[in-house]
């Protein structure tokens, strides 16, 4: 076999392996993060309906704020830059802590329960990016592939938030 054919076989084999890797990891991240994103959507919907039925919950908004501040202090995440951290992690080697996902999930649900103003979309991006980054670290991906996993996580959570995890 001549060298050109060997090179083409090697190159195509590497492309095939890379394609299979991303098919597996996109399905894995979609299932995990899409499920969490759907749960987030369900919780937001449930607490919003609950608040609409019990308008007196609005008076407990300061209590909800105290609980959220306590959670941030407990998890030592007082300098959280939110969605900016997730977006900057895509363009740099900055890591998104996994603790961001449950913290944002819980604090956003609490905020919506008591009638606070918090966007679901930014929260979904933070949750998905945090979990995607953690999956990238778990499987020891290089920096470029970690960035791809962060973006996969963000898109999985974002689409699940709108009730469209499967297209």
Placement of each model-derived feature along the sequence:
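Alpha-helical transmembrane segments and immediately membrane-proximal extracytoplasmic
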Residues: 1-167
């Amino acid at each position: 076999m001549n060298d050109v054919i060997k090179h083409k076989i090697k190159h195509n084999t590497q492309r095939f392996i890379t394609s299979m890797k991303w098919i597996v990891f996109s399905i894995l991240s979609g299932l995990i993060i899409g499920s969490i994103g759907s749960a987030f959507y369900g919780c937001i919907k449930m607490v919003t309906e609950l608040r609409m039925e019990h308008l007196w919950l609005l008076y407990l908004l300061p209590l909800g704020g105290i609980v959220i501040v306590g959670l941030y202090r407990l998890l030592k995440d007082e300098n959280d830059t939110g969605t900016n951290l997730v977006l900057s992690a895509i363009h740099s080697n900055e890591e998104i802590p996994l603790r961001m996902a449950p913290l944002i999930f819980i604090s956003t649900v609490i905020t919506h329960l008591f009638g606070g103003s918090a966007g679901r979309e930014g929260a979904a991006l933070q949750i998905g990016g945090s979990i995607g980054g953690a999956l990238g670290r778990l499987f020891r991906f290089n920096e470029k592939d970690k960035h791809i996993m962060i973006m996969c996580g963000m898109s999985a959570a974002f689409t699940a938030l709108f009730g469209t995890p499967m297209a």
